[in-house]
Amino acid sequence: MAVCPYGAAAVVMALLSAAIAFHCSPLLAVLQRALSLHTAHATKDMDNLFQLVRNIVPALTSKKHKGQDGRIGIVGGCQEYTGAPYFAGISALKVGADLTHVFCAREAAPVIKSYSPELIVHPVLDSSDAVEEVEKWLPRLHALVVGPGLGRDDLLLNNVRGILESTKARDIPVVIDADGLWLIAQRPALVHGYQKAVLTPNHVEFSRLWDAVLSSPMDTSNHSGSVLKLSQALGNITIVQKGEQDLISNGQQVLVCNQEGSSRRCGGQGDLLSGSLGVMAHWALRAGPEKTNGSSPLLVAAWGACTLTRECNHLAFQKYGRSTTTTDMIAEVGAAFSKLFTT
C-alpha cells in the first residue's frame, strides 16, 4: 500500500482547467474525473492506514498484568543531554507502554530521575561493563529506542555498539534516532539487513547515512525514491525520513505521512516520535501481518507514530502558537491518540 500526496495534482488540474475550459469542455470533464478518482483513492488509502494502526492497538482490559502492553528501553542520556531520553521515555508511557527503562550515563541519571518518578533509570551507560548491565534487562524488554541524548563520546558509542549487537542477537525491535544514527553512519553493518530495525533520520542525518552507504549522488528531486533506495542499500530495513512530509520505506514500498502538524519546530519532538514508535513497533510485531492486512507491521507502526506526533504538534500549536514546546506536545498525546486511533 503506497499513499501519495495529491495537493500537487490539484494545482496542476487547476492550471489545466483554466487553460482548456473555454476550448474543450469534454477534455476538462475527463481531467476533473481523473482528479476526483485520484483524490478518492488517496482518501481510501489514508482511511485504510488509520484502520491498520487501530488494528495493532491492544485493547484495554482488566485481565492483563503490568508489562504486557509494553516494556520499552531507552538507551541515551549524557551530561549535556538529559531532556531527550526523558521525552522519549515519557512519550512511550503516554502512548500506552506499561514500563519504560532509561539506560544513561551516570551523571545524567539524577537529572532524568528528577523529571519523572515514572521512569526506571539505570546509570550504567558510561561504565566499563555497560553492555553486560543492559544485557541483563534485554529479556524483559519488548523494544529498544537508541540514541536520544546519547552524544558522541567514544566510550558511550562503543558501549551502544555492543548493546545493538546483543539486541539483534535477541531479535528485539530497535528504533534508532539522533546520535544513534551518527553511530550507524560510521558502522552501517550494525543494522544492515536487520528487519526489526527502524531508523528515523531528519534531513541532515539522512544525507549522512546516504553518503555512508551509497556512492551515487542523491536525487534531491525524488525524495520518495531516495528513501526507498537507502532502505534497499541497508538491506531493506525500515527508514522514516522526517520532513515536511514524513516518508517511510522498507525498500519495497513508500508510505507518506502528511497529517497536518504546524509550522512550529521545537527541539525534542523527534524524541516524542521515537518513543511512540518504540511501543507501536512492539504492538505491530505482536499483532503480526494478519492484523496489518499483509502490510509490513513496522511500516504501519511508523506511519502511526508519525501521524500521532504531527497531531500532537497541531493540537499544541492551536493552544500555544509560537511558544509551543515538546512538553506541550506530550501533554496532547492522550487527546491525539484518542482522536486518531480510538473507535
UniProtKB/Swiss-Prot annotation:
GO terms for molecular function: ATP binding; ATP-dependent NAD(P)H-hydrate dehydratase activity. (6S)-NADPHX binds at G149, N202, H203, V204, E205, F206, S207, R208, D271. It holds the Pfam family Carb_kinase. Its main location: mitochondrion. Coiled coil: none annotated. The modification N6-acetyllysine is found at K63. It is an enzyme of class 4 (lyase). ATP binds at residues 242-246, 261-270. It catalyses: (6S)-NADHX + ATP = ADP + phosphate + NADH + H(+); (6S)-NADPHX + ATP = ADP + phosphate + NADPH + H(+). This is ATP-dependent (S)-NAD(P)H-hydrate dehydratase. The lineage of its organism: Eukaryota, Metazoa, Chordata, Craniata, Vertebrata. The gene is Naxd.
